[in-house]
Amino acid sequence: MKRAVLICGAGIAGCCAAIALARSGWTVTLVEKQTAWRFQSSGIFVYGNGLARFHALGVMEEMVAAGFAIADGRNVYLDADGSPLFETFYPGRFDGLEVTPILGIRRAEMHRVLSGHLSRLGVEVALGCTVQSIEQSRSAVSAVLSDGRVLACDLLLGADGIRSRVRQLLWPDVQPRYSGFGVWRSVHDRPAGLGDKIMMMAPGLRLGIMPISAQQLYLFGTVVEPVDAWYAREDWARLMQSRFSVFRGPAAHFLDELGPQSELLYTAVEEVLMPAAWHQGRVLLIGDAAHASTPFMGQGGAMAVEDAVVLARLLDRTTDIDRALERFSTVRSPACRFVQDASRQVGVSGARSDPQEHAGILDAMRTTAQARVDEFYARLEQLGFDHHQEETP
């Protein structure tokens, strides 16, 4: 008899989990509260560890074709005037697989690829629908949906983001925590000669430039923002210009052209810090619902797809769903907390606004940045599922 799963949330984690479990023979129902596909970020970049997991899902080649690949893994650091500081290179080999080191892609394109696989795999997708309540027995879950249906399943996944309805129902004390940072993003036409991932540094500010297709790139800037800051959408262009006006060089043209018709997004960055166990009975949280992070390591999407791949592998190896869920938390919690901690540290370092302190940070980065990249990804690989496969659930 086929096992059934209800997945709440059709972001990266939810879509990838639906694909992974459908490929493993599960009957999958995916519900999403939005009535149409909408995306809270114009662009995203995925490093090689995330692309290795997309390969495991069978979607990596389509992702690379839909985005912009940085084939040599180069990340160019510039000062606020656009003068070179140093470069780092990201790895293109994970768990024995050669992958693109860095991929930039529009969120809409990523979801187009994923939704195509959902359709081909026969996943039932219900938009404009969410979970109203959850009841559990020892070996099953029953969920009342907002469309009036009562759905029984073997497993329920809360992949419904930072403000997770599933988490609110079962873990009401776990609330998103404001990080102190805001992220400003904008989409622009890509000049033919701009093919690198660029990070520009100034005291208390970072501004990145990342190609996301042959035709487009996006800017992403981080800055300390007040708690509970809210800005009217019509002010976003002016505010982004004013916050990052110190940046010239390759960023100047893009900042100067911002206006009312620009594609812009402002996000107050929040984290989710769950207890070590991400499940209660047959209900499990994945993705941002369980471990939303600050963006400074660029690992949010990669951690979401890795959740999906690891969960499917664990469930493939046993008929004991409860034991697989316990093992999932044991494997994934340390890796995701490592990413959260590393990202937070990078953010705090970059937020230092004293010019002399900033200069000292840059001096240290010139000699240590590549080693830190290498150490981070080596540790991430050590914490990955492939290094735990000898243990059975």
PLM regions and their residue ranges:
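Conserved N-terminal helical subregion
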Residues: 1-5, 22, 49-190, 228-237, ...
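A short coil-to-beta-strand element that immediately follows conserved catalytic motifs
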Residues: 176-179, 194-196, 249-267
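Histidine-centered metal-chelating micro-motifs
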Residues: 163-164, 183-185, 205-208, 290-291
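Conserved mid-domain beta->alpha element of the FAD-binding
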Residues: 6-27, 31-34, 157-158, 240, ...
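Active-site substrate-recognition segment that forms the wall
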Residues: 196-229, 233, 237, 241-249, ...
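Conserved N-terminal glycine-rich FAD pyrophosphate-binding loop of Rossmann-like flavoproteins
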Residues: 36-52
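C-terminal helical "tail/cap" subdomain of flavin- and related membrane-associated enzymes
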Residues: 1-3, 65, 75-77, 81-82, ...
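Catalytic P-loop NTPase motifs of RecA-like helicase/translocase cores
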Residues: 37-38, 165-166, 292-294
